Amino acid sequence: MPVRTVIERGPKDKRSVAFSIDWPGWSRGARSAELALETLESYRGRYRPVAHLAGMAGEFAAAGPLEIVEDRVGTGSTDSWGISFSPSVAEQGPMGEVELERAITLLQACWAFFDGVAARVSPEMRKGPRGGGRDRDRIIRHTIRTESEDFAKQVGLRIPEGAALTPDGLRQHREVYIVALRAYNAGEVKRRMRSWTLPFLIRHSAFHTLDHTWEMEDKDLSAQGGA
């Protein structure tokens, strides 16, 4: 079966994004739609561990070529950062139970992959051309806090700053977040999202997690004896 893929172009056409609808987190941005598609395809192998952790290795291996099902204009974030920041046509309305549970399983696999990479990469990360960039712990803190203190608000969750940065706090956040995703889909959360939708929230959470996981992999200095 082809991989349903969406192209999202920035309003000023400075950057574009290509992402998979059915595999949350498999998303890449580039200077053009064509390059975004090429980059997305090149990351197929890098997404494979996530599918494996989700128990979907066979399904992912059988996935066919990328098939564009929507070509849309995104938001300013698409131009500025090369990321998708709004839901596609396919990500509207409530999710079916099977669809929701599949997406949640893949999100949990993204978390597990993130945790595994964070545990094995070097504390110091390779710097950029001008010597800038974050170390591993700053990447971890940013990834966790953005999800737990920002994204989770979309489904009615509020936690103290930094509360998810401890092992117990992170485990509790993830458990409560999953409960909240299910509750929102069931209509049990009174305050509804304005511009986001539940499928987009799950996809965006997965993308943000994987984007920084791959960043840590790419900047890992372990092979060079990094501390």
Task: Map each language-model feature to its residues.
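Short, contiguous alpha-helical
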Residues: 4-33, 37-56, 115, 123-171, ...
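A broadly tuned preference for mixed-charge, low-complexity surface segments
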Residues: 68-80, 168, 178-182, 192-194
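Acidic/histidine-rich alpha-helical segments that form the ligand environment
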Residues: 89, 93-120, 163-190, 200-210
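Generic signal for short, ordered secondary-structure residues
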Residues: 15-16, 82, 86, 93, ...
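Short, flexible segments with low predicted structural confidence
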Residues: 7-9, 78, 85-86, 110-112, ...
